[in-house]
UniProtKB/Swiss-Prot annotation:
One of its GO terms (biological process) is translation. One of its GO terms (cellular component) is cytosolic large ribosomal subunit. Keywords: Ribonucleoprotein, Ribosomal protein. It comes from the Bacteria. GO terms for molecular function: structural constituent of ribosome. HAMAP family: Ribosomal_bL35 (MF_00514). This is Large ribosomal subunit protein bL35. Belongs to the bacterial ribosomal protein bL35 family.
Length: 66
């Protein structure tokens, strides 16, 4: 049986935390900031954790990632 390979696009978007969680960065941060409030822009800077409903699927894609 062949080895399971890491999904490279996912590996670039998610980082493992020390406790085993997955950290992600927020969407809507590349352009068109004039339509967003200062508060929205500030909150978009912070990373967040992957939602539990998506965790199992994403974990299998990045299973080999440390």
């Amino acid at each position: 049986m062949p080895k399971q390979k890491t999904h490279r696009a996912s590996a670039k978007r998610f980082k493992r935390t020390g406790s085993g969680g997955l950290k992600r960065f927020r969407a809507f941060t590349s352009h068109r900031f004039h339509g967003k409030t200062k508060k929205q822009r500030r909150h978009l800077r912070k990373a967040s954790m992957v939602h539990p409903g998506d965790f199992k699927r994403i974990k299998s894609m990045v299973s080999q990632m440390r």
